[in-house]
A protein has these predicted regions:
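Detector for C-terminal structural segments
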Residues: 318-346, 382-389, 415-531
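Short, low-complexity disordered leader/linker segments with a strong preference
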Residues: 1-40, 50-53, 83, 93, ...
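Alpha-helical secondary-structure segments
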Residues: 116-123, 165-171, 213-214, 242-243, ...
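Surface-exposed binding/hinge segments that line
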Residues: 102, 121, 137-194
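Ligand-site clamp/hinge motif
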Residues: 200, 232-277, 400
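Gly/Pro-rich hinge or "lid" segments in bacterial periplasmic/extracellular proteins
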Residues: 172-239, 243
Length: 531
């Protein structure tokens, strides 16, 4: 496919130019070895959204905040939920509507204040206060009184019942199978009431992030790096590192150059660079993982051009997913057959990869009386190659997709404001449940906040029924039907592939893991004898 190859060649030259420009600097590995300090530097793109986990869904922000903040529960590297600030898993009433939770005693925030029920109450009430602008209320708004707060009818959460300083009850409006699972997500991290309130709009900016986690933020210029040091008041095992740095490097080639020069100890390895490194000197330092998410072409379903189902169907038919995976993605992906990832219950294993048929795509447009539909796909730098490949595929079917690469921060704001006609991204549930992958993005009330504006009452009805059922087999069948409506009847989204992710880590780095898109760095250790 000459057009595709030409597009990719241009991008490759651009990437090489950036790589050669570089960003030098001497390695500090020898200094840390001589001093006996364990210093770990992780390279990642700058999320540019702050570190307040109530107001963003960015995995890069999570990888930083994850070291400072803790919730009642968390999902570990093995995708199992475990107690953190809660003493035990919740006691659930017979009707499934009341959850009683007891906090561990003796836990302090890094500012020295004690963790009590008041902090948990404050955290949830802040979440549902409209001025906060929380992006994840749909995961918790079944708590009684949450919607009243969101609608400005109340300032306190009626469904939060304080028993004493360490025990509380959460009352919910209906049975919700994933409720405890959602309490284990970063979005439900517990904030210190006094410190958070005092910080106001600056919470999550600079060093204004205080938690009960193993590290505290010492420096954060929000542009180049975040420096963390051990939390001396941590209630758990003493952190392994003396200093943890997250270094912001947006360009993939530059990031790998910094890794090769020893200026960072670990970073993600973009799939576009996999061929360059997989058989070279770094091959033994590469770890590949298969996350639960799906990469897709996200489209604004109420857009004047893309609101026409024929255009969306033609787009799907024009894309050669198998070729995309084998060429652009260097084989580190599987062509999609549904929006739900194969590892998520509700994925239909009987479905085949979405059809690729350029002739049929043209016919679908002709039958609808549509000629040369044109739209713009705005992406971040990391999705540029995928978008360029899609552009070439669509051109063969008579569809013009203009591609613009924009700053990650601008992209996040534009998506939330519903200003993107189309974009490319991956959506990853933090645990294997379709509610977390599909309801969060395409249920009509949530689709607005994601900038896709998908709205189908039949889909909503299936999703609502599934999230209120405790019958796992029934939920699976409901999710299969919902996914089929979303991605094969409405073409409300264009699933592309199930990607594999890679990272590189120096031989002296211990416990390097990627927990389904989020790098959990709090367990990282350094073997100084190998440096």
């Amino acid at each position: 496919m000459n057009l595709l190859k030409k597009s990719l060649s241009v991008l490759a030259v651009a990437a090489m130019a950036v790589s050669l420009a570089g960003c030098g600097g001497s390695s500090s590995s020898s200094k840390s070895t001589e001093s006996g300090e364990k210093v770990f530097r992780f390279g990642q793109s700058n999320p540019k959204v702050g570190l307040d986990m109530q107001t963003n869904t960015n995995s890069g922000a999570s990888s930083v905040a994850d070291n400072v903040l803790e919730g009642l529960y968390r999902w570990n590297d093995d995708n199992k939920e475990e107690c953190v600030l809660a003493k035990d898993m919740p006691e659930v009433s017979d009707d499934g509507l009341t959850y009683t939770i007891t906090l561990k005693k003796g836990v302090k925030f890094s500012d020295g204040s004690d963790l009590t029920t008041e902090d948990v109450k404050y955290t949830f009430e802040r979440m549902f206060t409209p001025a906060t602008g929380c992006t994840n209320t749909y995961m918790y708004n079944m708590i009684t009184g949450a919607q009243d707060m969101l609608d400005g009818k109340a300032t306190e959460l009626s469904g939060f019942e304080t028993v004493d300083d360490y025990t509380f009850k959460l009352h919910i409006n209906y049975k919700f199978a994933p409720f405890v699972a959602n309490l284990g997500m970063d979005y439900a991290s517990i904030y210190p009431s006094d410190a958070c309130a005092a910080a106001g709009e600056n919470w999550g900016k600079g060093t204004n992030l205080i938690g009960t986690g193993p590290y505290v933020i010492k420096e954060n210029d929000e542009q180049t790096k975040v420096v963390m040091v051990p939390n001396k008041k941590y209630h758990g095992k003493k952190p392994n590192l003396d200093r943890l740095e997250v270094v912001y490097i947006d360009d993939y080639s530059t990031k790998m150059m910094e890794y090769e020069q020893g200026n960072i100890d670990m970073c993600d390895l973009d799939t576009s660079l996999l061929d360059q490194y997989k058989d070279g000197d770094l091959k033994d330092e590469i770890t590949q993982v298969t996350p639960l998410g799906t990469y897709f072409l996200s489209i604004k379903d109420n857009d004047p051009v893309l609101s026409n189902k024929a255009v969306r169907e033609a787009i799907s038919l024009a894309i050669n997913r198998k070729e995309l995976c084998s060429t652009v993605l260097n084989g580190a992906a599987e062509p999609a057959s549904s929006f739900l990832n194969p590892g998520v219950p509700g994925h239909d294993d009987k479905l085949k990869t979405y059809e690729h048929n350029v002739k049929k795509a043209k016919q679908v447009l002709a039958d609808a009386g549509i000629s040369n539909p044109t739209f713009t796909c705005k992406v971040r730098q990391k999705e540029e190659k995928i978008a360029t490949a899609l552009q070439a595929y669509l051109k063969e079917a008579g569809i013009t997709m203009n591609v613009e690469t924009i700053d990650a921060g601008i992209w996040s704001s534009a998506r939330a404001a519903g200003e993107l006609q189309a974009t490319v991204l991956g959506w990853f549930p933090l645990y294997a449940d379709a509610d977390n992958q599909m309801y969060t993005y395409y249920y009509s009330e949530n689709a607005v906040g994601k900038g896709v504006f998908y709205n189908n009452p039949a889909f909503d009805s299936l999703m609502k029924e599934a999230r209120e059922s405790n019958d796992s087999d029934k939920r699976v069948e409901l999710y299969k039907k919902a996914d089929y409506i979303l991605s094969r009847e409405d073409y409300g989204t264009i699933p592309l592939y199930y990607g594999k992710l890679q990272f590189v880590a120096k031989p002296y780095v211990k416990n390097a893991k990627l927990g389904n898109l989020i790098y959990h760095l709090y367990n990282i250790d350094i073997d100084l004898s190998k440096k």
